[in-house]
Swiss-Prot record:
Chain residues that bind L-aspartate: T122, N126, D127
Family: Belongs to the argininosuccinate synthase family. Type 1 subfamily.
GO CC annotations, alphabetized: cytoplasm
SUBUNIT field: Homotetramer.
List of residues binding ATP: A10, Y11, S12, G13, G14, L15, D16, T17, S18, A38, G120
HAMAP family noted in UniProt: Arg_succ_synth_type1
Name recorded for this polypeptide: Argininosuccinate synthase
Binding annotation for L-citrulline: Y90, N126, R130, S179, S188, E264, Y276
InterPro entries: Arginosuc_syn_C, Arginosuc_syn_N, Arginosuc_synth, Arginosuc_synth_CS, Arginosuc_synth_type_1_subfam, AS_cat/multimer_dom_body, Rossmann-like_a/b/a_fold
Lineage: Bacteria, Pseudomonadati, Pseudomonadota, Gammaproteobacteria, Alteromonadales
Keywords in alphabetical order: Amino-acid biosynthesis, Arginine biosynthesis, ATP-binding, Cytoplasm, Ligase, Nucleotide-binding
Amino acid sequence: MSKVKKVVLAYSGGLDTSAIIPWLKETYDDCEIIAFCADVGQGAEELVGLEEKALASGASECHIVDLKEEFVKDYIYPTMASGAVYEGTYLLGTAMARPIIAKAQVEVALKVGADALCHGCTGKGNDQIRFESCFAALAPELQVIAPWREWEMESREDLLDYLAERNIETTASATKIYSRDANAWHISHEGGELENPWNAPSKGVWTLTVDPEDAPDKPEYLTIKVENARVVAVDGVELSPYDALMLLNEKAAAHGVGRVDITENRTVGMKSRGCYETPGGTVMVAALRGIDELVHDKPARKWRDQVGQEFTHLVYDGRWFTPLCGSLLAASEALAKDVNGEVVVKMYKGQVTAEQKRSPNSLYSEEFATFGDDNVYNQKHAEGFIRLYSLSSRIRTLNSKK
């Protein structure tokens, strides 16, 4: 333990990381603590006074790194282009943020000459795996410290007592029962009443979106332009990836879009329940799927679904910095180049639907698909196809009658 001289801590200013700073100094022979905070769009209010708080807790420096644009452009957009959705519902909001945070933390550690990295993830969750897998891929020479797997404290009350004994102020309290994680893409809510799956989430759980029952009685429509499976404009206004997401977050949240309540399978083996709010992301996914339906044939969509599922588990399980990630992204981008066009989405009472869609790469032909008269499709041709398509079934039945 005495060998650790300088540690870079992934710091949020919350209860856990506020307690970790003095614990590190006490446990590792008064080592130097560098606090690192990644701005991934969790909200400006979360960053106010953060540096002062870190220094007051015992850190010698606090590095706040703006990663918002990079996060959306290089992590969220490629993941959504792949069609990744965990267990049919979860849009990977927490999981997608971990690799960029870990990468930036490693960069700070190498810059300041640290010999260890530290995170505040619990020993029960997925995040410890995600962070440490990234650390192993990017800087295996650095020691990793995970206080929740080392110290004897077991509850929020223990942490509050620990800080009180050292006269370190915190805004946390035993009554703040939910564990939340926010970024530009989403906010997650866990703990408290949600730990019993028979309990419906109370109104106090949700913080980002309007209750669908209280949403406007009139729907709102947006025209979304997509290029290479990326949203590039909304209602004719070209926007950066981050600005597009922020606008869609605002619009969709007002209509209660993007709420999910799921019980998921964690990488560590247990099930956990989470309530997630992903308003803008839910609209983006609806728009991308609308274009995807037009431009990809059956084999391409089947392949995209396979790639998406593989990429889903790669992101969820913390394997971003691996050769497999590069391979899956390459496959995804090969299909994404055709996902171009415009979609009109309708947002109403918690729902979003793609009402209108068009693409220069569309494989849909009204001439062929019409139920009316046409001069391009000879329906008699279907007979020979069906005989060949069903040949194995025909042979199987004939053989059974011999």
